C-alpha cells in the first residue's frame, strides 16, 4: 500500500484536494472546487496531539569550562557598538588560546571615560583612564534597535517564524509565504522548525516527508549562516524541533558543515536563568551570534551549544485552536510559577484548524483569520495576547511565534507588537522583496467544499 501522497494541498486557495491516496482510494471531482474521496484510508498520520518527551530539570547549576567549543575558527574584525547612556569609549585587543581562537580589534563605546584595555582570556587586564566631556550616543543598532545593544538577550521580545522553512505554494502544510532570507531581512529573529532523520540525513519536513519536504537541514542552515555573516550586529535564535527524538549528535554535522558552528553561542552555565543571559553587545563582540535550542533529547553535557529548550524556556499552549489564546504555561508540564518567572517564555500565536480525515489528523494554519490573528489589537490579535501575557507574568514574552508574519492589519503589524513590548517604535518596511509562495487570502465567500466518504464525515471551512 503506497503511503499517502497528497493530503489537503490547496486549503489556502479555498479548495482542499486529497493528501490521502493509496491503491484503495479513488478521487473524483464534483465540480465548482468540490472534491469527493471514496475508498479506505489505512495510513495513520497525526499532528493534532501535544508533543511530549523527556523534560530535563536541574537541582543545581552546572558551570561550563571555556574549552567546550567544537571546531576551530578565526575572526578578525573591527566593530563599533555604543550605548545610549555612554559617554566614553574603550579600545580592546583580545586573543584566545582556546581550540576556537579569535583575534579582535574592537572599538566599544561604554562607561564614563576613555579606557584603553589590553586583556587575555583569563580576564586579567590593565586600564588607563582619562576624562572626557564629549557625550556619546549610540547609533549602531543591535537586532534593529540601538536600545537593544545594552539589553540582555532575555530582556527583548522577538518575532519567531513558526515552521520557518515551510514555504510551498498551494500546500496546506506551509506556514510562511517568504523564504528564510526575506524573513531575516524583515526582522524575524527566531527561526523554528521540525526535523526528520531519513537514512542518516536530517530533512525539514512537516509531520511527514511525504506531505511536505523542503530539503535538508544543512542546506537551510547554510542559507541562514550566509545571512548571519553579512549582518554582524544581529543575533539570531534557532529552535529545532526534534520530531523523531533522535540522538543530538545527529545535529552536529549539519551545523558544522553549514558554517553555523563558527557563530554558535555556548552558555557559560546550565541551565540559564532569566538574569544569566548576556547583553546583545556582549554576544555581538564575541562573534557568537547564533543561539540554538532543541525541544527534546538535548544533551548539554555532550553538546553544550545545543541548548535544551524547556529547562530554559517555557511555552504557552501548543498549536492553539482557541482564538482566545490563553497565556498559560503548558510545556514543560507542572512548572511552578516561581520557576516559570525565572526563565524565558514563548507565546504560541499561530491559530490552527484541526482537520481529521479517517486516521489522518492535522493542524493547519487558519488562514481565514490571519489579518486579525497577526493584528496589533482586537480579539484574537497578537497585540492582545502579548498584553495579556505581560499582565499575567509581569513581563512580555521573549518570543512571539506566528504563521505568515507578513499578514496582519497592516504590513509589519507583528513587528509593531514586538516593538511595543520592547518600548521602541517600529519603523521598518515589510514584507519581502517578492513572495516566494503567494497565498490566496480567504475571501468572504465559500470557494470550495470537501466531501469525504470514508466512513467518517468532515465539515471544513473553505474560504
Predicted regions and their residues:
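Catalytic cores of phosphodiester-bond hydrolases, prominently lipid phosphodiesterases
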Residues: 2-463
Amino acid at each position: 500500500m503506497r503511503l499517502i501522497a497528497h493530503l489537503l494541498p490547496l486549503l489556502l486557495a479555498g479548495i482542499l484536494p486529497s493528501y490521502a491516496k493509496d491503491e484503495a482510494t479513488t478521487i473524483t471531482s464534483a465540480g465548482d472546487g468540490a472534491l469527493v474521496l471514496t475508498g479506505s484510508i489505512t495510513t495513520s498520520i497525526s499532528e493534532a496531539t501535544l508533543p511530549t518527551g523527556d523534560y530535563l530539570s536541574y537541582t543545581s547549576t552546572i558551570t561550563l569550562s571555556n574549552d567546550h567549543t567544537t571546531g576551530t575558527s578565526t575572526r578578525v574584525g573591527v566593530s563599533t557598538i555604543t550605548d545610549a547612556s555612554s559617554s566614553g569609549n574603550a579600545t580592546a585587543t583580545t586573543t584566545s588560546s582556546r581550540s576556537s581562537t579569535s583575534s579582535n580589534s574592537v572599538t566599544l563605546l561604554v562607561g564614563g571615560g576613555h579606557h584603553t584595555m589590553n586583556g587575555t582570556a583569563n580576564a586579567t587586564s590593565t586600564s588607563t583612564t582619562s576624562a572626557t566631556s564629549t557625550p556619546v550616543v549610540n547609533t549602531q543598532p543591535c537586532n534593529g534597535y540601538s536600545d537593544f545593544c545594552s539589553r540582555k538577550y532575555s530582556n527583548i521580545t522577538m518575532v519567531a517564524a513558526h515552521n520557518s522553512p515551510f514555504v510551498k505554494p498551494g500546500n496546506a502544510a506551509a506556514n510562511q509565504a517568504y523564504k528564510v532570507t526575506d524573513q531575516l531581512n524583515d526582522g524575524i529573529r527566531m527561526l523554528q522548525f521540525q526535523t526528520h532523520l531519513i537514512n542518516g540525513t536530517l530533512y525539514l519536513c512537516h509531520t511527514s516527508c511525504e506531505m511536505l519536504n523542503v530539503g535538508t537541514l544543512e542546506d537551510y542552515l547554510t542559507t541562514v549562516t550566509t545571512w548571519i555573516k553579512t549582518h554582524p550586529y544581529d543575533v539570531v535564535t534557532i529552535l529545532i524541533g526534534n520530531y523523531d527524538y533522535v540522538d543530538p549528535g545527529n545535529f552536529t554535522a549539519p551545523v558544522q558543515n553549514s558554517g553555523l558552528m563558527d557563530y554558535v553561542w555556548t552558555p557559560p552555565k546550565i541551565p540559564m536563568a532569566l538574569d544569566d543571559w548576556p547583553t546583545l553587545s556582549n554576544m555581538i563582540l564575541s562573534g557568537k551570534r547564533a543561539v540554538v535550542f532543541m525541544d527534546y533529547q538535548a544533551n548539554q553535557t555532550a553538546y553544550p551549544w545545543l541548548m535544551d529548550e524547556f529547562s530554559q524556556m517555557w511555552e504557552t499552549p501548543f498549536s492553539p485552536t482557541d482564538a482566545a489564546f490563553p497565556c498559560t504555561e503548558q510545556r514543560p508540564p507542572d512548572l511552578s510559577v516561581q520557576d516559570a518567572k525565572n526563565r524565558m517564555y514563548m507565546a504560541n500565536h499561530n491559530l490552527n484548524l484541526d482537520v481529521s480525515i479517517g486516521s489522518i489528523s492535522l493542524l493547519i494554519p487558519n488562514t481565514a483569520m490571519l489579518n486579525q490573528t497577526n493584528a496589533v489589537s482586537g480579539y484574537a490579535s497578537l497585540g492582545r495576547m502579548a498584553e495579556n501575557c505581560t499582565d499575567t507574568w509581569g513581563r512580555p514574552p521573549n518570543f512571539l511565534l506566528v504563521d505568515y508574519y507578513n499578514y496582519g492589519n497592516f504590513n509589519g503589524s507583528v513587528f509593531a507588537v514586538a516593538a511595543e513590548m520592547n518600548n521602541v517604535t517600529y519603523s521598518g518596511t515589510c514584507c519581502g522583496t517578492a513572495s516566494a509562495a503567494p497565498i490566496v487570502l480567504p475571501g468572504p465567500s465559500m470557494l470550495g467544499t470537501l466531501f469525504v466518504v470514508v466512513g467518517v464525515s468532515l465539515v471544513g471551512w473553505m474560504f
